[in-house]
Amino acid sequence: MFPLLLVAELVVLSLVTSVKSQETDPLHGSKDQPLFRGADRNDFAIVVSPGAIECFWQFADQMGYLYFSYEVQRILGMSHDRHIVATAHTPQGFLIDTSQDVRGQINFATQETGFYQLCLKNEQNRFSSIQVYLNFGVFYEGPEVDHKQSQRKQLNDTLDAIKDSTQRVENQVFHMWRFYNYARMRKVADFFLLQSNYTYVNWWSTAQSLAIVLSGALQLYFLKRLFTASTTDTKKPRC
């Protein structure tokens, strides 16, 4: 009975390990199913815990351009250090670039096809979480990389010209969208800073008002004590 239980536990552990490896490895997939590449453009906000590391994977083909922008929006905790470390790694795990600031960008050309790792490290704060807005993705200059493109028929010169013009317009609109998202990140960060300053000024004004009222009450109390004298039959106040 005991050997059967031991074998069953080993089977369960192997299944759990295989499931975990499938969840954590972005490159893992069956040979029969196509590889899930994900979206080419991503923008969202995330909260990084104290001393934690948050990583994301962006798929990119060779000869593309990958951009990674970040903006610290606010700090949730006692610390006031708004700096965060951003890193980018190749699909093989080699470091490409590092940025450590309140806001920054990492842009580079993709030299190989695969999942590029983008990480945020909140190593400067041990007691405060940081809310960061992210905007990252990949774009391609010139013809889009596609394995099926070689099998398509060649279009005539007029359609090629229309396609090139449309692609140039699309690239320009895409870059406008990138700059718009970066400006939106700055706007949200300024809003949280303004809200924090407003709360600080209100609390400081309230504390000063209470201090003024308390000091006035104490002064009135001590002045009243100076002019108040106890009178008895043998001890009377003198002029």
Curated annotation (Swiss-Prot):
Question: Would the keyword Secreted turn up in this protein's UniProt record?
Answer: no
Output the Gene Ontology cellular-component terms: endoplasmic reticulum membrane
Q: Which InterPro entries match?
A: Emp24-like, GOLD_dom
Q: Which residues lie on this side of the membrane: Cytoplasmic?
A: 224-239
Q: Entry's Pfam families?
A: EMP24_GP25L (PF01105)
Which sites does the entry annotate for glycosylation? 156, 197
Q: Does the keyword Endoplasmic reticulum apply?
A: yes
Report the membrane topology from the UniProt record.
Single-pass type I membrane protein
Record key words, sorted: Endoplasmic reticulum, Glycoprotein, Membrane, Signal, Transmembrane, Transmembrane helix
Per the record, what ranges lie on the membrane's Lumenal side?
22-200
Would you identify the family this protein belongs to, as annotated?
Answer: Belongs to the EMP24/GP25L family.
Name the PANTHER family on file.
TRANSMEMBRANE EMP24 DOMAIN-CONTAINING PROTEIN
User: Per its record, how is this protein called by name?
Assistant: Transmembrane emp24 domain-containing protein 6
The organism named in the record is: Mus musculus
